[in-house]
Amino acid sequence: MSDIQSRTDGFSSKLMEILDHVEYRRVETGEDMEEVARIRYKAYKMADILTLKGTTLIDDVDFDPQAYVFGVYYDERLISTVRMHHVTPDHRVSLTRDTFPKEIDAFLDAGLSLIDPVRFAADIDVMREMPAIPYLTLRIAIMAAAYFDADRVLQLVSPQHAAFYRRVFYAQTIVPPGKLWKVQYRPDADGDQHP
């Protein structure tokens, strides 16, 4: 067995072991939203990516009828969170659309539906011990795409994370690299390119 195959098998086995302790839950109560705000605060402060004011940690969009905040719990402890938007031609609420309106509207004007996972945050202390958290959390986007029969899943991606999204999700760049860039991937990863 090759060294690469051995490492891949080891990673997959470890991931499956972790999944035995993981529960995915939709966050709907005030108490759970406070926990989401706590994790967002710690993660965003460490990454220096958002102004850390109360209105930026939990906002009105968290309660939009087509936004779904999920928590990933490890042995009943919230370890990460992500917010999914089901974006349709008739319901265009999306943080990614706010950033790239022309590009996202092109998809929506073509009649496509999108899943827009945003506000990913992980407990930084747990992240050090369990680097698989992004895999565990972002798989929710794939499940949402299947559930809503979405045509695309969008991701705002920083340059240092682009290779991860290309490798794991077959991501394609739809906005050229710049101050912000964006990649998208197809739920079926068949490689077709459509507007």
Predicted regions located by residue number:
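Acyl-donor binding region in acyl/amide transferases
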Residues: 91, 95-191
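Beta-rich nucleic-acid/ligand-interaction surfaces
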Residues: 58-63, 160-163
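Short amphipathic alpha-helix that is part of the acyltransferase structural core
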Residues: 10-59, 69-73, 78
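Acidic, low-complexity proline/glycine-rich segments
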Residues: 1-9
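A short helix-loop-beta-strand connector motif used in the catalytic cores of GNAT acetyltransferases and
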Residues: 61-71, 91-93
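Short glycine-/small-residue motifs
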Residues: 81
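A short acidic/small-residue loop/turn micro-motif
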Residues: 86-88
